[in-house]
Amino acid sequence: VSRVALGMMSYGAPSALSWSLDRDRAEPIVRRAVEAGVTFFDTADMYGDGASEKVTGRLLRALFARRDDYVLATKVYYPMGPGPNDGGLSRKHIMSAVDASLTRLGTDHIDLYQVHRWDAETPIEETMAALDDLVRAGKVRYAGASLMYAWQFAKAQHAAERHGLTRFVSMQTRFNLLYREEEREMLPLCADQRVGVLPYSPLARGVLAATGPRDTDRAAAERGRSRLTDGDDAVIGALRAIAAERGLPPAQIAMAWTLAHPAVSASMVGATRTGHVDDAVAAVDVALTPEEKSRLEEHYRPRAPYGHT
């Protein structure tokens, strides 16, 4: 797959999210990504209550000549209706959810079907068996996971191995210069088990892309949720200093740092402008020196993990 994956959460539901784009506004951005060599696209059934999957499917069918020329990923877990079986990772929900996603995406298979969260209410053996059945049926090519604690991910992999079921091939998790808690256990676990890590939010929702005090809408929202601390200012300062020395946007330096981790296979990137795509693709070719990496990392202060539940 391409080392940049275009996250499709930003497309399909402008009425629900102020920063979401409709199909017409999303088309030139996705087209720019395709022209730049991006072949990996990630969405979820709950993004825009299914609207993102619909837009994703329509755009990719229009921009690619063959279905085999791109990798399509989506996710399952969050409620998609009011009923007791309309969410979670039970066999019943997974089996109905995958068919609904296939219909919205307009395809006969999903390349990477990811569980969006850990489901404490469903035995992991039931979840892994359902995913294995989807792979055997040809509806899904590979199974992936997202946002778990390392012990949960290890438990899932062990359950699959113990019962001869399909194992997860990927872990999508938060990882950037301002949130590095996954370096403790998850990234080493994935490296040891040869599982591809797919970091999302490499720019901390736009905070690391800013060149000055003016925030993006999502960066302002992040500050409003108290995710950022005063200690992050030193990291941001080092990032901007290195970017200035290189004559590059801070976004390229921040994404280059994420991509440089040996466990990372591809980075999930959201884009609401074509320039966001350009920065992400250019970051693939940015090689940071050991001294630059040290400067970017030395000011980090550990924090409590979040986002797994």
Question: Where are each of the predicted segments found?
Answer:
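Acidic (Asp/Glu)-rich catalytic clusters
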Residues: 59-69, 102-106, 135, 157-166
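Alpha-helix N-cap and loop-to-helix initiation/capping positions
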Residues: 18-25, 51, 55, 85-93, ...
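N-terminal binding-site loop/beta-alpha segment at the start of enzyme catalytic domains
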Residues: 1-70
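Short, acidic/polar
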Residues: 20-33, 88-105, 153-157
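Beta/alpha (TIM)-barrel catalytic core signal, keyed to glycine-rich beta->alpha loops juxtaposed to Asp/Glu
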Residues: 119-298
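Active-site groove signature of glycoside hydrolases
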Residues: 102-122
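N-terminal small/glycine-rich loop or linker at the start of catalytic domains
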Residues: 1-17, 73-86, 109, 114
